[in-house]
Amino acid sequence: MNETTPLLLRAARGEHVERPPVWMMRQAGRYMKVYRDLRDNHPSFRERSENPDLSYEISMQPFTAFQPDGVILFSDILTPLPGMGINFDIVESKGPLINDPIRSLKQVKDLKPLQPEESMSFVGEVLGRLRESVGNKAAVLGFVGAPWTLAAYVVEGKSSKNYAVIKAMAFQEPELLHQLLNHFAESIANYLSYQIQSGAQVVQMFDSWAGQLSPQDYDEFAAPYQQKVVNLVKEKHPDTPMILYISGSAGVLERMGQTGVDIVSLDWTVDMADGLKRLPQSVGVQGNVDPGLLFGTPDAIRSRIVDVVKKAKGRKHILNLGHGILPGTPEENARVFFEAGKNVNELIKVSS
């Protein structure tokens, strides 16, 4: 066993590992009492995610509690926007609000190139502190929102159920949208490189809303910009594993595997065995336990983890949920998830 490289990083690189590493999307958050207590004292989400002391403390909360194999930066996919000249706020229970939605060519042309070391130095500070704190016990993960999802937020101005405004732009003014997406792709690639230089060992790109696109529109408005981000980052950091996650990805799974990422994160609506058949052998998988299962019994959680891990055997696999952990999830069930992931080899023997 290689003691000097974290398990998750070895797995993401495709090295032989003793078990799949385990972490959870949104593992730092509202389901944890320590987070809710901190939130009561610091009610502004932007303060919690942009104050380096708070972001560091929150990022470390699940590591202190559960010792996952990955520690992800506590931040938000919209955090880079002010550095490009787009102001936003996150309102509890309502989500993000963009003060001045991007709807015109002038607004796109007025956007600033992102210089993360100037506008987001707090991110670099937190990542460096996380690396120092967890050492080789866990891999430090960075993340970004993909261009389509960022565009969906800034064009709509808020979360949306049907994405009518950005789809109207896509089908009426496609060149305008392409300019916006290209700006985001270049800025996000720059931001990811900054995260890697600051200490992130694995990075994940969330294209949360790309699952709202038809396959042909995914090919035009999402995939090329995912690929551009991957290519720009890999030019500078060829050895840093990259993960792509899309919520509701069943219709575009094969396309995700062609973007150049190292790992595709599956949501829980795709059976792990089926998902593997639909992806190239060289592409690893992450996932894909239904987060709703964590409201169930410990035995149900263990049984599903065994099922997922057995189906992924022989491929590079990172055990995770198929979406972020849900608010209200019992903390003890999160503990069961992590412990079952770490003891999965024994659980598989018992189940055979």
Curated annotation (Swiss-Prot):
It is an enzyme of class 4 (lyase). SUPFAM superfamilies: UROD/MetE-like. InterPro entries: UROD/MetE-like_sf (IPR038071), Uroporphyrinogen_deCO2ase_HemE (IPR006361), Uroporphyrinogen_deCOase (IPR000257). One of its GO terms (biological process) is protoporphyrinogen IX biosynthetic process. Keywords: Cytoplasm, Decarboxylase, Lyase, Porphyrin biosynthesis. Gene3D superfamilies: 3.20.20.210. One of its GO terms (molecular function) is uroporphyrinogen decarboxylase activity. It catalyses: uroporphyrinogen III + 4 H(+) = coproporphyrinogen III + 4 CO2. Its main location: cytoplasm. GO terms for cellular component: cytoplasm. It is found in: Cytoplasm. Pathway: Porphyrin-containing compound metabolism; protoporphyrin-IX biosynthesis; coproporphyrinogen-III from 5-aminolevulinate: step 4/4. Its EC number is 4.1.1.37. The keyword Lyase applies. The record marks D76 as: Transition state stabilizer. The keyword Lyase applies. Pfam families: URO-D. CDD domains: URO-D (cd00717). NCBIfam families: hemE. Catalyzes the decarboxylation of four acetate groups of uroporphyrinogen-III to yield coproporphyrinogen-III. Homodimer. Belongs to the uroporphyrinogen decarboxylase family. This is Uroporphyrinogen decarboxylase. The lineage of its organism: Bacteria, Bacillati, Cyanobacteriota, Cyanophyceae, Synechococcales.
